[in-house]
Amino acid sequence: MKKQILFLFLVLGLIYITACAPAQQPQPTAPKQEPVAQPKQTVTQPTATIQPKTEISAEVQELFDKSKTRVKSIKYKYKGPETGDQFYDFFIKDTKIRYNPYLAIKTLDKQDSYDSIFIDKTAKTAASYCLAAYCAYKGKKQDLGYSDAYIPTVFDWITGLTKAAKIGEEVIDSRSTWKVDTSKGILWVDAFYGIPLKGESSGKSYRFQQLSVNVVQDSDVVPS
């Protein structure tokens, strides 16, 4: 009987000890680290410069090339948007240009009166002069803005074209010309010298008359 009572107390003691023992806490674990997204690297590709496609027929190019071998200098009368209803006299040799604007007032008796514009394409300079015998005050008058004073020449019209094709033939000023559709407009190009006698572009007309080839001297285009 005593053994049974002792065993009972032993069992009760074990139950009490178990009930009073602190519950085992789970071990904390480190939070799971999410992978850091790397910023996307943008590779900038170099931009290729697209050159305009040149479409100039072989026969027209051969016509334009005549101006390089047959025209060393030239003088002509020009009428265009810059001149109104009047003609300007042009003299061209190499990179030197002189043109004489139309003078509504023929007297050149003022200090700032001028009758000629001289242009140097290489130096990009322009200046006004009074050279006529009846100039009261001869010599240089003032420097001018190059872009303001410059008027495209017969050579400029056939330079830097990206398109040119023959569309016909006509006679202008008793000279045979090719009618050529170009990226700058319609040109009537002298069949022998390869330079335009007429041009039409954006509804405007340009005329080059009384051409004289290879007669211009340095003294005509360089102020003295």
Question: Where are each of the predicted segments found?
Answer:
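Short, exposed beta-strand/loop patches in secreted or surface proteins that constitute
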Residues: 64-68, 87-93, 117-119, 163-171, ...
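Short, hydrophobic/aromatic-rich segments at coil-to-beta transitions
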Residues: 68-77, 93-105, 172-181, 192-198
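Extended beta-strand-rich segments in extracellular/periplasmic secretory proteins, especially
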Residues: 137-140, 148-201
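Positively charged n-region of N-terminal signal peptides that target proteins for export
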Residues: 1-4
